[in-house]
Swiss-Prot record:
Identification of the protein by name: DNA integrity scanning protein DisA
Subunit structure and binding partners: Homooctamer.
Species per Swiss-Prot/TrEMBL record: Shouchella clausii (strain KSM-K16)
Disulfide bonds: none
BP GO annotations: DNA repair
Top-level EC class as recorded in UniProt: transferase
Superkingdom per UniProt: Bacteria
Pfam name, any one: DisA-linker
GO MF assignments: adenylate cyclase activity; ATP binding; diadenylate cyclase activity; DNA binding
Domain DAC: residue ranges: 7-145
Amino acid sequence: MEERNRTAFIQNLLKLVAPGTPLRAGIDNVLRAKTGGLIVLGYNSEMMNIVDGGFFINSDFSPAYLYELAKMDGAIILSEDGKRILYANTQLVPNNNISSSETGIRHRSAERVAKQTGNLTISISQRRNVITLYQGEYRYALKDIGVILTKANQAIQTLEKYKAVLDQGITNLGALEFEQLVTYSDVIQVIHRVQMVLRIKQEIQNFILELGDEGRLITMQLKELVSNTEQEALYLLKDYAKERTQDVKKTLKELTTLLNEDLLDEQAIIKALGYSRTSNFLEQPASPRGYRILHRIPRLPSQIIENVIDEYGHLSSVMVATEDQLDEVDGIGEARAKMIKDGLNRIQEQLFVDRHI
């Protein structure tokens, strides 16, 4: 939960101060001028108690105004959305009893103000060229764009490797499904790989938020790599969850919140699928319902797939059904029945060619 809250904090803040936003342009101007600065977003009742002196500005925000006002020693107070400058050259007097891990006066004041008020507080270092964000108990230092780009590119390369391993795992699983040789161990291995890919994706999305306008190419690469991974994961969970009515979106979210060490625990994934923990469960045969494979057949609507699974229950039963039998399913005519049979045969042939033995 703590890690999730911190991730949400970072994501919300980075949207405000990402490159390309007016606030970030103003902050960068202050950083380059080496004047330092202390900026608080929001003026609530708690803020009123700690603000002393200064000038009431109440003007629309602009990067140039922020730069000029930062030349004065005091703190600048903006509206909560950062679109208006409310006060300038104010002295902030937070409660000295609030603990702070910072050493510099400006950073210490920023941390205490953030803890006391819950407002976003931005401290711009005069000498170290560092921008630090505080809100409540959270602290985040913005990194140099070049450093972030390097890390984002490294993460994309890592994602490519993990995605290739995942794709091969899904191909192998598909081949086993047609041979009716799947065990829960095979399924859990693929779910684990899906989660690793989704976690790297989340990390790259944080980099993209921090890069702002500079992250367009990274965004395009990310979409190209993992555009269908989440949907594939949902079909996989629908295939193997104990109950067909299980909310697989909720299950996927629960798996995403597992700690890395818990994700390696196969029993945690078994529990998420709705099964009880037993010692030999992993080696038991698993029979997919067929959502993932049937969705690979072009122009086959989701409702028709639901009707097929309502009728047959599992992929193995669909595979042995004749065209005439499929024709009797609600919504499936002669043409669709032929399309399903041909589609399954084509997918099976392709999977057998592509899989690694």
